[in-house]
């Protein structure tokens, strides 16, 4: 069975790739550049991840998506919310995380990316598109949910001749379990970039950084990325 993977270089997409690669032939990785704050880091780190797995990478620019996005993930004039461990619950969203999700929302981003990936998957005879959608974030990002995945699969049954499907190995997992599974699969987490910002080091305060930090704290090991960066 063959697959294409969506790779942002974030914790979830790197973990999903590593897990899927244990049982599937990964044809290529697609990375999107839509003007996101962390774009430079994501391109740099995703290239390292592809080298690790020995797979082809295709970088696709979506300038128009950045142009129509007014939230802080792209718009440098808007502030990215800062959170703490106390603000986040693995099992249910809070008012703070719902606010944070709205502050970084990109219009129909996952829908656009999946449909582009669907074209590549069909053209290459691939059965699956591997994604890092996960259970923890599904509460605040509905386009991470099982219902969304099923809806996309249904659409692909009409729009692709080979019935491409979305494969989300992390769909039922929280971040702590994701880290455990990623380490078991020997994922190159030292080259996974979760931060919404694109600095030399992760900010440690955005929602993505906080969720990641809490997961490593829960299992009692140092984040391989921070170790590599000497933090």
UniProtKB/Swiss-Prot annotation:
ATP binds at residues 7-17. GO terms for molecular function: ATP binding; ligase activity, forming carbon-nitrogen bonds; zinc ion binding. InterPro entries: QueC (IPR018317), Rossmann-like_a/b/a_fold (IPR014729). Pathway: Purine metabolism; 7-cyano-7-deazaguanine biosynthesis. It comes from Methanosarcina mazei (strain ATCC BAA-159 / DSM 3647 / Goe1 / Go1 / JCM 11833 / OCM 88) (Methanosarcina frisia). This is 7-cyano-7-deazaguanine synthase. Its cofactor is Zn(2+). Keywords: ATP-binding, Ligase, Metal-binding, Nucleotide-binding, Zinc. Binds 1 zinc ion per subunit. Zn(2+) binds at residues 195, 203, 206, 209. SUPFAM superfamilies: Adenine nucleotide alpha hydrolases-like. Pfam families: QueC (PF06508). It catalyses: 7-carboxy-7-deazaguanine + NH4(+) + ATP = 7-cyano-7-deazaguanine + ADP + phosphate + H2O + H(+). Belongs to the QueC family. It is an enzyme of class 6 (ligase). Catalyzes the ATP-dependent conversion of 7-carboxy-7-deazaguanine (CDG) to 7-cyano-7-deazaguanine (preQ(0)). Its EC number is 6.3.4.20.
């Amino acid at each position: 069975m063959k697959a294409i993977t969506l790779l942002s270089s974030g914790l979830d997409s790197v973990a999903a790739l590593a897990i899927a690669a244990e049982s599937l032939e990964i044809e290529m990785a697609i990375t999107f550049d839509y003007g996101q704050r962390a774009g430079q880091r994501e391109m740099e780190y995703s290239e390292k991840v592809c080298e690790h797995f020995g797979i082809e990478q295709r970088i696709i620019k979506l300038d128009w998506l950045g142009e129509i996005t007014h939230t802080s993930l792209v718009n440098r004039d808007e502030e990215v919310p800062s959170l703490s461990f106390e603000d986040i619950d693995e099992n249910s969203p809070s008012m703070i995380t719902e606010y944070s999700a709205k502050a970084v929302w990109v219009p129909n981003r996952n829908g656009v990316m999946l449909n582009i990936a669907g074209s590549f998957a069909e053209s290459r005879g691939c059965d699956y598109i591997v994604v890092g959608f996960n259970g923890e974030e599904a509460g605040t990002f509905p386009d991470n949910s099982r219902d969304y995945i099923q809806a996309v699969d249904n659409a692909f049954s009409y729009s692709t001749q080979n019935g491409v499907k979305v494969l989300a190995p992390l769909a039922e997992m929280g971040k702590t379990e994701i880290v455990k599974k990623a380490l078991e699969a020997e994922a190159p987490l030292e080259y996974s970039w979760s931060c919404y910002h694109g600095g030399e080091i992760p900010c440690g305060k955005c929602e993505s950084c906080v969720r990641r930090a809490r997961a490593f704290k829960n299992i009692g090991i140092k984040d391989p990325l921070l170790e590599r960066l000497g933090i």
